[in-house]
């Protein structure tokens, strides 16, 4: 197992000095965080915590991921029990593993090593009902954390939507300050499940926004003028009412793939969180026609093709580095 080498703090767009953690007394607060899962998002969580002065021990099933993390100042653990053994009392553990069975499997391994004073954070895209169940079943205090920002969070920080006990949230505030864009980039949404509920709806809104941009650019693409779509996106994103990060990614897509999106397929993957959003809306008798139509377009994209769907396919790579399906 590689030996941990502490790396110097780096200054980013949100400088480390802006994200220093302090106790109510004004004294610096360096916490010891355990991170389980060093994929794209988990590694960013660990890196930003280390950059802010916190100690991080991490476990991943990939030996390569652990070796790379060790080179970056993260203490590698040989197993989940080994990770738990390195942490103090209370233990602070952040799960960043795929939703569903992997979360339950990690919690099962952690269970013998947890006490009521510990805090476990699930930063993945879990269903809010699963988070409610896990909070009730887990000995430790449980925080469900909707995480938005994709790989760009490495530089900018994430937006964190957190549910669970208020005392646990306050204890981990220094870590949330480090991982998020700053103090304004995270908040407690409510009790267990609320964080992942808000993130679910966030994803539904994201579907509708992607669909709207896709339809607009499809009309421009098929319209009566020979337009430079990259220039349109750039112009819109400088002062227009509809400016956004997604629109920046539209500009990037046209610049890198060309005005016709090259060989980008019309197959748009994903859809689970959008499905959850629509089901919840039906249960609550809330009309969400834009989200519903966007979800339907995504499913239809797997059968036939449109320019708007090809753009949505490419945008998923832009914000989340998801696979681009190509012809």
Feature map (PLM): residue ranges:
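Serine residues within intrinsically disordered or low-complexity segments
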Residues: 15-17
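NAD(P)+-binding Rossmann beta1-loop-alpha1 motif at the extreme N-terminus of oxidoreductases
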Residues: 4-7, 19-91, 151-153
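Hydrophobic beta-strand scaffold residues
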Residues: 56, 76, 142-143, 288
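Rossmann-like NAD(P)-binding element
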Residues: 40, 61, 74-133, 154-163
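Rossmann-fold dinucleotide-binding core
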Residues: 106, 126-204, 211-214
């Amino acid at each position: 197992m590689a030996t941990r080498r502490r790396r110097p703090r780096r200054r980013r767009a949100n400088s480390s000095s802006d994200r220093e953690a302090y106790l109510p007394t004004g004294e610096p607060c360096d916490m010891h965080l355990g991170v389980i899962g060093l994929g794209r998002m988990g590694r960013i969580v660990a890196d930003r915590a280390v950059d802010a002065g916190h100690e991080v021990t991490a476990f991943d099933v990939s030996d390569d991921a652990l070796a790379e993390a060790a080179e970056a100042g993260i203490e590698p653990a040989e197993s989940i029990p080994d990770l738990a053994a390195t942490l103090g009392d209370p233990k602070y553990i952040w799960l960043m593993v795929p939703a569903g069975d992997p979360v339950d499997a990690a919690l099962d391994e952690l269970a013998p090593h947890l006490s009521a004073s510990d805090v476990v954070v699930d930063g993945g895209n879990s269903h809010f009902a699963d988070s409610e169940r896990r909070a009730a079943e887990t000995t430790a205090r449980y925080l469900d954390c909707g995480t938005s920002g994709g790989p760009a969070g490495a530089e900018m920080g994430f937006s964190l939507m957190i549910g669970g006990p208020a005392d646990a949230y306050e204890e981990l505030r220094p870590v949330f300050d480090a991982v998020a864009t700053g103090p304004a980039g995270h908040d407690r949404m409510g009790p267990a499940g609320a964080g992942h509920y808000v993130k679910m709806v966030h994803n539904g809104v994201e579907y509708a926004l992607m669909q709207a941009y896709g339809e607009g650019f499809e009309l421009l693409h098929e319209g009566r003028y020979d337009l430079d779509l990259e220039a349109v996106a750039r112009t819109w994103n400088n002062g227009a009412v509809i400016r956004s990060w997604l629109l920046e990614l539209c500009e990037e897509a046209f610049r890198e793939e060309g005005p016709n999106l090259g060989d980008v397929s019309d197959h748009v993957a994903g859809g689970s969180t959008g499905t959850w959003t629509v089901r919840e809306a039906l249960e609550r008798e809330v009309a969400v026609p834009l989200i519903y139509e966007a979800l339907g377009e995504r499913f239809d994209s797997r059968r036939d093709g449109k320019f708007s769907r090809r753009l949505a396919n490419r945008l998923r790579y832009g914000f989340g580095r998801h696979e681009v399906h190509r012809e």
